[in-house]
Amino acid sequence: MVADTKLYDCLEVRPEASEAELKKAYRKLALKYHPDKNPNGEKKFKEISLAYEVLSDPQRRKLYDQYGITEGNAAPPPPGAEGGPGAGFGGFPGAGPGGARTFHFNMGGPGGAQFFSASDPNDIFERVFGHAFAGGGGMGGGMGGMGGMDDDMDMDGGFGTRTRGGGMPGGFANMFGGGGAGPHARRSHPSFGGSRPSQPPAQNEVITRPLNVSLEDLFTGCTKKMKISRHIIDASGQSVKADRILEIKVKPGWKAGTKIKFAGEGDEKPDGTVQDIQFVLAEKPHPVFTRSGDDLRMQVELSLKEALLGFSKQISTIDGKKLKVSSSLPTQPGYEITYPGFGMPLPKNPSQRGNMIIECKVKFPTELTPAQKTAAEAF
């Protein structure tokens, strides 16, 4: 028999729930109520984060089951709660103005309360999922990224990174009747009897799929909508199939190999883990141009006469403009003409472009007439 069930009710589990069941419940609810996915879910997201933080720690859960939990006020904890005898969890300052949220277990008796400071819900999310939520907006401007994709155009490393903004306004008022956290209540590391080593983040399984894009779309930028089918765990615990449209904003100048990652958009597993989906950009072959970094290369075919006496040709650039290419001098096979600023946009500065390089390919005749042989010998 537990003293209080608010935290269990918040995670929609029974008080007898196992560690795996708690984690599964948190994952499901965190994805559902994360403010970047559900603009109205901020309060609920904070509540389930606190619930999971307490119940996933065996020592805290034991105390919660015995005594329940109450939000502290702005005053410092009573004597004995800050590292003295009987404090139990080391010194945790009270939630002063703008400070971290402080809670205590209702143990009764002078100096008997056991205090701890609630962590930033974003940190809890990262510890469980192994990354920040990939999306924009939400939680006081705390989450960066665009539609689930990495905003770094080189895209060699991590994905869906976030920057920390101010703390989340509001609080756990529905559960505990307390006021909101101060504007700087961003990050607090709980400690029970001294510093607790941080746990390595769980690594989600990543499902990789190709994203084929034409050279023209990579030149202008585009939006691709990808329909995916995934398996999710419904309220009854059964795995059901669900379709979803993922929107990918391809930026001008992106290169083959660019990775776009969507956190938590893959299959939900019975153990509570959720797969990530990662798209890897691939360039479709182009009939005229080949790409070399930010440069575009193409070939112009010349007859032997044009190679010897000069030529004038009109070509089309990748964006459809007409460009005159000419020479009045003999042209060697493989000779290259470079036109700066007619290549691909630079990913980090799309207003600038690479080069267009034109290679002259001389077409030699397969046979010569007697007159041509005589002319060639005279030449």
Curated annotation (Swiss-Prot):
An annotated GO BP: cytoplasm protein quality control
Compositionally skewed regions (Gly residues) per UniProt: 81-95
Keyword Chaperone: yes
Region (Disordered), start-end ranges: 69-95, 176-205
Short name of one Pfam family: DnaJ_C
GO cellular component terms, A-Z: cytosol; nucleus; protein aggregate center
Residues in J domain copies: 1-70
Record keyword Chaperone present: yes
Key words of the record: Chaperone
Function: Required for nuclear migration during mitosis. It is required for the normal initiation of translation.
Record protein name field: Protein psi1
